Amino acid sequence: MDIPKHPTSIQLLRLLPLEELQKFATDSHTDYKAKKLTGMRMLCMMTCAFLETTRLSQRYIGSDWGNLSFAELFGLSLEQGRVSHSSISHRLDTMPVEFFEKSYSLISEIGEEITTPEERARHNLVRVDSSMVQDVLGKLRDGMTMGRKSGTGHPDRKQLKYTMAFDGFKVLAADIFTSGSYASEDLAIPEVVLNAVNSSKYHNEIYLFDRGVSSTQKLGAIDEATREKSDSFVGRLKLSRVIEVTGAAGTECGRTVDGIDIISDDYGNLRTKSGKPDVHQYRFIRIRLNKNRIPARTVKGKRRVYDDEVLLITNDFTSSALEIAGFYRRRWDIEVFFKFLKQNLSMAHLISSSENGLKIVLYMMLIVASLVMIYEKLNSQGPREAIHNMRIELMNWVFLHPVDRGQGRLEIATQDDLPPKSNG
């Protein structure tokens, strides 16, 4: 694929593999009984809508239906007028999620084409974490109810959980959980980790997650899956976790580098509920963080308490203890990614009430995030600057391609058609 060195947002949108996606839509019967809102039209309309606003809604998506400028941009035939938000809601409920998952997979391959082998080696750290989004408007049909005290008189607000495996450039696996049982990270994170391990075409990946995963059984499943593909994981345990130590793993105890003090580095096993050692052998690294960290203030004015000591668990027996501690530090990158999605790509605004629709919106959000990261990399810009410039370029393109609403014809504006500049 011929990718410009410094592409505009319009050039990136024209790189979308529309022919291949149309073939997949036909083969997967995505457009069964759909005359107007086909999968391709929904894909293109939602892509532009995500780039245009930070507060996405079904009505906003429907308002772009009659924008014939977008019809020319994507080579689609669109009719004039609006599409009702109820029609969009119905399509979000019924369209197969696999079409949008496949679309994200194909579009993320564009990013792989501009990634060098050295950069790919740096992307072998896969951060896995979850982020909660609250349903403020009461749209969700199903959701988790968390954090509300009984007897306050306030109705329970439902929440949903986004869980993703992010390698720094693309999301290897993602899912949305609405069942209350998935409030525990012991269920959500292992499920996404195993999906990422099974779907990734790469080897030697290192999966990073926090201490929400503590189940001996789940850690064992992750250990077996990662070893099978020559991958590994680095997690975190509670400091009070009982460990059956079988031997010393390293010689770096007592070393301090970049504010990290290695206290102990041992081989051992976790104990099961019955008190017996588990069959899986791990490496346990206890570290102390010497750098003073200023905790962020919470709403109630209390300081958040950080542990000075951290207990890491891993099945990586070759890297040094300091290297593994450095890997775990990079887990924070996914928190920055979640923040970007919430602030710039409407992650916190729920535009569908069904789980099917929420998953479609999730993959659409990731598609646009991939385009933003490609634009950001090729134009040497930060994420906020990149998405700001992409929005301006898209609006400028629409302005330079006005539409004769009376006849429904495209009228491409030239420089001579623009109003003269004022001398004042």
Model feature map: region roles:
Residues A71, V97-F99, Y282-I287:
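Short helix C-cap/helix-to-loop transition motifs enriched in small/turn-promoting residues
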